[in-house]
């Protein structure tokens, strides 16, 4: 082999034909185009550097970093409890998963995982599954819009509005609520919370059926998604791909089953898989997972029992029954009485908890949850102080974007849109 000889090693799709064509192609026939970072089909500020020959993508590379927020670095300067407010803003379409993963890590470092009240775990599971539905609705709605199916977009966003309104009534915010806290949740469900949740689930059934009726057997939709964005099991394992992309290869990998957390082992649900390794299989997985999430939420409502929503150790956890005063300003008299009405020591503990934060024993842990996009992991390091020494997130969108080249090179430019939509990346989680 000479120094000038080019060696290309690749696999999947029609790579052999691509290599043969590349050897005899005139370099002048190829052009490099930038798709994004401002483009309606890249799911945010994702830049795709494409080398194309006619309508064929010969090389695809991702350019990221346009939404960098420095959240992981900011966590090193905030108390452990304050960190929830930051992490909820990373993958902004599934904030409850960011919060839960963070809190599970803090609780594991504190050694209080087994002390979390049952009601807290039920509420966490319920909020995560509602969030899974809302996230999948955005994936299907935007994916349909990018391929020219406008009606599913309207159906999906109207259905998502039901869930966001529910989040607002429970947490006070539609998104990024910082509701999950180390040791519990910020506050209990409102008195009519279970009734509102049951009504929301009932209202979601019709739009979910309508979404399936529009696309499941739609000939145009199937032509645009079947055998497009192909990535088999070997490719997924080599790249560390998880979530619906991995399950579209037929492997039933779901952390809720393989490594249960928050009591998921107590719920009955199926891990949805497909065997096409393509965009259509990922679409069907998301459709069916929404119905499985509804099953889980219904079981949560059955398991919901009265009880505390925060661990009882007031040296570790803020009170979870914060109420605003009758004038709309400050804390309510009941809340103030609970903080300082028992003893001066109780007031001192509360003051130190708010002004200094909790001290977490030195150590490091890794905790992962099954987000709508795959394995969302947190590597958390404590030096024994009141702030994290380091918190690193393994965001599935970042990992899954590695598959863009394998899914799209050798295919048409139009199929690249399908491949990216089937990955469903959220750039807030990619760049952090």
From Swiss-Prot:
A GO term from the CC aspect: plasma membrane
This protein's encoding gene: nuoD
Keywords from the named record: Cell membrane, Membrane, NAD, Quinone, Translocase, Transport
EC numbers for this chain: 7.1.1.-
GO molecular function terms listed in the Swiss-Prot or TrEMBL record: NAD binding; NADH:ubiquinone reductase (non-electrogenic) activity; quinone binding
Function (record text): NDH-1 shuttles electrons from NADH, via FMN and iron-sulfur (Fe-S) centers, to quinones in the respiratory chain. The immediate electron acceptor for the enzyme in this species is believed to be a menaquinone. Couples the redox reaction to proton translocation (for every two electrons transferred, four hydrogen ions are translocated across the cytoplasmic membrane), and thus conserves the redox energy in a proton gradient.
Pfam family, one: Complex1_49kDa
Record text on subunit structure and interactions: NDH-1 is composed of 14 different subunits. Subunits NuoB, C, D, E, F, and G constitute the peripheral sector of the complex.
Xref: HAMAP family: NDH1_NuoD
PANTHER family (alphabetical): NADH DEHYDROGENASE [UBIQUINONE] IRON-SULFUR PROTEIN 2, MITOCHONDRIAL, NADH-UBIQUINONE OXIDOREDUCTASE 49 KDA SUBUNIT
Subcellular location: Cell membrane
Membrane topology designation: Peripheral membrane protein
Cell membrane as UniProt keyword: yes
Keyword Signal: no
Catalytic activity: a quinone + NADH + 5 H(+)(in) = a quinol + NAD(+) + 4 H(+)(out)
Record-stated family: Belongs to the complex I 49 kDa subunit family.
Protein known as: NADH-quinone oxidoreductase subunit D
Coiled coil, from the record: none
Species per Swiss-Prot/TrEMBL record: Mycobacterium marinum (strain ATCC BAA-535 / M)
């Amino acid at each position: 082999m000479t120094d000038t000889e080019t060696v290309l090693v690749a696999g999947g799709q029609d790579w052999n034909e691509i290599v043969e064509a590349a050897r005899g192609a005139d370099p002048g026939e190829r052009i490099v185009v930038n798709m994004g970072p401002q483009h309606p089909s890249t799911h945010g500020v994702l830049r795709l550097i494409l080398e194309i020959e006619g309508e064929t993508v010969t090389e695809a590379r991702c350019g990221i970093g346009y939404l960098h927020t420095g959240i992981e670095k900011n966590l090193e300067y905030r108390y452990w409890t304050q960190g929830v407010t930051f992490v909820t803003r990373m993958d902004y379409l599934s904030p409850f998963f960011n919060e839960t993963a963070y809190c599970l890590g803090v609780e594991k470092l504190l050694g209080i995982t087994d002390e979390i009240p049952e009601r807290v775990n039920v509420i966490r599971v319920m909020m995560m599954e509602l969030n899974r539905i809302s996230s999948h609705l955005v994936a299907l709605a935007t994916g349909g819009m990018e391929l020219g199916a406008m009606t599913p977009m309207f159906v999906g966003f109207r259905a998502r509005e039901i869930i966001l309104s529910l989040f607002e009534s429970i947490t006070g915010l539609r998104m990024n609520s910082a509701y999950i806290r180390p040791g519990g949740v910020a506050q209990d469900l409102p008195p009519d919370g279970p009734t509102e949740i049951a009504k929301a689930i009932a209202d979601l059934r019709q739009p979910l059926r309508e979404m399936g009726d529009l696309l499941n057997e739609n000939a145009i939709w199937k032509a645009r998604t079947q055998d497009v964005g192909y990535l088999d099991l070997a490719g997924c394992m080599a790249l560390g791909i998880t979530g619906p992309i991995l399950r579209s290869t037929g492997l039933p990998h779901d952390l809720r089953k393989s490594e249960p957390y928050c009591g998921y082992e107590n719920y009955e649900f199926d891990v949805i898989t497909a065997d096409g390794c393509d965009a259509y299989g990922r679409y069907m997985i998301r459709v069916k997972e929404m119905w499985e999430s509804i099953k889980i939420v219904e079981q949560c409502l059955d398991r919901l029992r009265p009880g505390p929503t925060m661990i009882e150790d007031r040296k570790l956890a803020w009170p979870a029954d914060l109420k605003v005063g009758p004038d709309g300003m400050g804390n309510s008299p009941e809340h103030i009485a609970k903080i300082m009405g028992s003893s001066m020591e109780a007031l001192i503990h509360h003051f130190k908890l708010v002004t200094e934060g909790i001290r977490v024993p030195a150590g490091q842990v890794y905790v992962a949850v099954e987000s709508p996009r795959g394995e969302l992991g947190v590597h958390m390091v404590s030096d024994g102080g009141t702030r994290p020494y380091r918190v690193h997130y393994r965001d599935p969108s970042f990992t899954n974007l590695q598959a863009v080249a394998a899914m799209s090179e050798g295919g048409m430019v139009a199929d690249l849109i399908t491949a990216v939509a089937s990955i469903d990346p959220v750039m807030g989680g990619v760049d952090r």
